[in-house]
Amino acid sequence: MSFKATITESGKQNIWFRAIYVLSTIQDDIKITVTTNELIAWSMNETDTTLCQVRFQKSFFEEYEFKPHEIVFGENGVQVIEDTYGNSHKLYSFRVNGRHLTTISRKPDGDGIKSFTIAVNNTSTCPESLANRLIVVIEMDSLIVKEYCPQFQPIKYDPIIINLKYKRRFLDVFGTAASDRNPQEPLDPKLLDVFTNTERELTSALFNEEVESDIRKRNQLTAADEINYICCNSTLLKNFLDNCNVNVTDEVKLEINVHRLSITAFTKAVYGKNNDLLRNALSMSNTISTLDLEHYCLFTTIEDEKQDKRSHSKRREHMKSIIFKLKDFKNFITIGPSWKTTQDGNDNISLWFCHPGDPILMQMQKPGVKLELVEVTDSNINDDILEGKFIKTAISGSKEEAGLKDNKESCESPLKSKTALKRENLPHSVAGTRNSPLKVSYLTPDNGSTVAKTYRNNTARKLFVEEQSQSTNYEQDKRFRQASSVHMNMNREQSFDIGTTHEVACPRNESNSLKRSIADICNETEDPTQQSTFAKRADTTVTWGKALPAADDEVSCSNIDRKGMLKKEKLKHMQGLLNSQNDTSNHKKQDNKEMEDGLGLTQVEKPRGIFD
């Protein structure tokens, strides 16, 4: 055999089947390139706007062998290349029908696949019927062996190294920014691992002779060096794309700054010749915080570097935007979840993009598999990269420090009053109540010449108001009337208490069972230091809560109201006892009088008439 590769694990079989299907949706023909270390399956559409490439490492297959020196038939597909170290490598490329290969690779429903093998036998001993044919052998769990031999056409491999160029620029721009970063703001160790793995990949790549390193300092960067990088969990994007119908929405827009990532699926309106609406415009979007992303590196510009340092909060954050097609992107995202059991649990997707109109590179990596998608973007976006004069790079920091900083900022409530925060320093002051954020603020002159911004007082608002309540002095008049009414009530109770003391003096021997006398209770009510606030039924009001006085020597209103009501109930009880005693004494006097008079005639005597 010139080439042979076997897959026995079910998870690897699923990702192989899914990758072949996605490649067939881009182009009917799939190109396969075989090297000593990997198998590359790729396809490009007819308009050259989408390129999908899947690299299967040698370790992905349980059995992998490649003997290019034995190839006799189809020698047009053999190539010899040299790497950066001067070592020669042979590879073999051919093109096969993707529809046929997808149908062959489809997993049956009622039976499992024990092993899946693809092979090429273009040696001198192969029969003519198997020359330039891809041999596909499938062994089922039911001991059934299926063998297919679709024909292929040998081709030359013309590598498209957009991925290597983007990654080299990524290291040149942000690798130097990471080295010049402030030691007090360290980078995420995972991001440093990304830099290391990218450098290792560029070093071991076979087609990197055209990729040149141009490492420069931050102050030497230009607008042409722009490169942006985003890394997040593929589930964040997949959950959104599952709700998008490719027949309704055909484009995707990504917008990102240092605070949030917004992904929008939309379709533009289509009008006919007579300005008739043929298709409505539709869009749906989702916003993700940058704290939920793994890493991000943004390339922006600023107008003034000194002003940026002085007023960081006031400057406008630059938003990076990119637009590309939805269909291929959605199919590409669905390859990752087909492999359910991952060894390292890496479900991240990485994106590199430059200016609008330049291709966008997407990459997902599994153990032994690397999936890449390149799409041409829309150039009809107003990019503000040339507005500024100074280049600025934004790199995501450590997740732990970002989480602590976010927690500190979130602990402080935006509605908390400053007076309440300083209450500990002012023991005898009243804590400031929280003002409603919906109340309209107005300007009132202070004691000095300056004008201070204040809020309206927390006055009670009734559902049913009187005309007098709309006046400005209504609150003061109301407080005066309440104070006068309380004073009158206190005078009435005091006069009542004085009158009752004389009545209680007579039957004092009958009320010995009571613990406290009425006179004592009256004396307590006459004590001005223990005047109580009388509880009354409040009106129906809509108002904000008001804090109680924070002084320690004052008694709470609830305790005062409770004591006052208790004293009132005792007075009522004593008055009831006195009334009942008076009633019983009156009944006894009447009974004694009747006993003294005796019982008389029950009928009044009348003279009898003539007819009686």
From Swiss-Prot:
InterPro entries: Ddc1 (IPR026217), DNA_clamp_sf (IPR046938), Rad9/Ddc1 (IPR007268). The modification Phosphoserine is found at residue 436. Residues 585-596 have a biased composition (Basic and acidic residues). The keyword DNA repair applies. The keyword DNA repair applies. GO terms for molecular function: DNA binding; protein kinase activator activity. Residues 576-612 are annotated as: Disordered. It comes from the Eukaryota. Keywords: Cytoplasm, DNA damage, DNA repair, DNA-binding, Nucleus, Phosphoprotein. GO terms for biological process: cellular response to ionizing radiation; DNA damage checkpoint signaling; DNA repair; DNA replication checkpoint signaling; meiotic cell cycle; meiotic recombination checkpoint signaling; mitotic G1 DNA damage checkpoint signaling; mitotic G2 DNA damage checkpoint signaling. Gene3D superfamilies: 3.70.10.10. It is found in: Cytoplasm; Nucleus. One of its GO terms (cellular component) is nucleus. Phosphorylated during cell cycle S-phase and in response to DNA damage. This phosphorylation is MEC14 dependent. Also hosphorylated by CDC28. Present with 238 molecules/cell in log phase SD medium. Belongs to the DDC1 family. Component of the checkpoint clamp complex composed of DDC1, MEC3 and RAD17. The interaction with MEC3 is performed in a RAD17-dependent manner. The checkpoint clamp complex loads onto DNA in an ATP-dependent manner through its interaction with the RFC-RAD4 checkpoint clamp loader complex. Interacts with the DNA polymerase zeta subunit REV7 and DPB11. Component of the checkpoint clamp complex involved in the surveillance mechanism that allows the DNA repair pathways to act to restore the integrity of the DNA prior to DNA synthesis or separation of the replicated chromosomes. Associates with sites of DNA damage and modulates the MEC1 signaling pathway and the activation of RAD53 in response to DNA damage at phase G1. The complex also physically regulates DNA polymerase zeta-dependent mutagenesis by controlling the access of polymerase zeta to damaged DNA. PANTHER family: CELL CYCLE CHECKPOINT CONTROL PROTEIN, DNA REPAIR PROTEIN RAD9. This is DNA damage checkpoint protein 1. It comes from Saccharomyces cerevisiae (strain ATCC 204508 / S288c). The lineage of its organism: Eukaryota, Fungi, Dikarya, Ascomycota, Saccharomycotina. The gene is DDC1.
